[in-house]
């Protein structure tokens, strides 16, 4: 019994030693010492000011902060480190001579959050240069020689919050990076000061939210003087935005090769800036934004009657959306007034006042009024044209009259206006004279110079003897005579 018990104990001892050796072999890994000319403190590796031409090899995998500033590095290749530094969150490469960075240089450091490339010799930011840094929050590129910035250089950098590009030679920056909220959604600071910018998309800049404009630095650029530029910066000054308030003296523009401060009203002769109110018509749908200088703030709206808008206003048309904006379903006249937005954050509070003017008519009804007035005006013009056509273009009946025969040499003529109830008949045309009504009534008018008014003779004048005419022939009226309607002597023929 005793030998078997000893044998069993021996086997247990050997098994324990084997398991111990296996665990040691599995957990064992090469220990990397601190590189030469570097200072290691826990997970911080400092190799600054060592005149290094290349990055030290065999960097410890636990490194969280790597300082390579103030050296002689000129190129950052894809294989600059053979070790994948997944714990590295800060990389300092400032004050070197870097003029080339590979598009795959940041693949070994996918969790980098802070990258300092300032004070180098970079000229171009190529396409997808920083696209592998999806966790990067701060990028320093100031004091380089950057001229060209590709619009896709900062692709897939959803966590980027601060981008420093001052003291370069940039003449055009792709501002669509900040206009499109999906490109760099968390960007709160963009420093483009001390560059070569001459023109700005002023209309697009006005539409940016206040928290973007608050961190958009544009001072010390040779901007072209313009009243719209003054209006833009005056609005930022009115809102107390840091990008203007901190550098008012450095905001200048160029006119006739001379520098002028943007706020020089005497020189610009620009109208003074006044904050405009929101305008709406009856029945309009309107959304008023609480344009705060910081993101993620809690917003509370107060109506002109000093009532807090919780979910729905007193008249049932005003609500507050999830993003803190004031929404009007159908604007009413009583909705007009000054609304106040109280924004509260962890370290900053802000109060905004917005005036709403409501016009007491619908926009559609206003167009109907204009259409009615236009139709009335057109109708009046057409009426005047028709009257003018009737007066000046109506055919004259005298055009259709035949040429009258001249009167006889005695001047005897029968000037009459025939008034008859039946058509004229020739009495000698045959048939019985009693078969039809052939009685004519005429008012004779004096034809000669010896007659006075109403057929009476003037003193000293004689009535001329008329010349006999053929049987059945009518006398021609004298064209020089007056119409017989003024005669008072009826004659039955």
From Swiss-Prot:
Domain annotation LRRNT: ranges: 28-61
Comp. bias (Basic and acidic residues): 431-442
Biased composition (Polar residues): 408-424
Record Pfam families: I-set, LRR_1, LRR_8
Modified residues (Phosphoserine): 477, 481
Limits of the LRRCT domain: 221-272
Gene Ontology CC: one annotated term: perikaryon
Keywords: Cell adhesion, Cell membrane, Cell projection, Developmental protein, Differentiation, Disulfide bond, Glycoprotein, Immunoglobulin domain, Leucine-rich repeat, Membrane, Neurogenesis, Phosphoprotein, Repeat, Signal, Transmembrane, Transmembrane helix
GO biological process: axonal fasciculation; axonogenesis; brain development; cell adhesion; cellular response to L-glutamate; heterophilic cell-cell adhesion via plasma membrane cell adhesion molecules; homophilic cell adhesion via plasma membrane adhesion molecules; myelination
Placement of LRR repeats on the sequence: 62-83, 87-108, 111-132, 135-156, 159-179, 186-206
Inducing stimuli: By HMGB1/amphoterin; in cultured hippocampal neurons.
Gene Ontology terms, MF aspect: potassium channel regulator activity
Topological domains, Cytoplasmic: 394-493
Extracellular side: 28-372
Residues annotated as signal peptide: 1-27
Family: Belongs to the immunoglobulin superfamily. AMIGO family.
Known partners and oligomeric status: Homodimer, and heterodimer with AMIGO2 and AMIGO3. Interacts with KCNB1.
Protein name: Amphoterin-induced protein 1
Organism: Rattus norvegicus (Rat)
Protein's gene: Amigo1
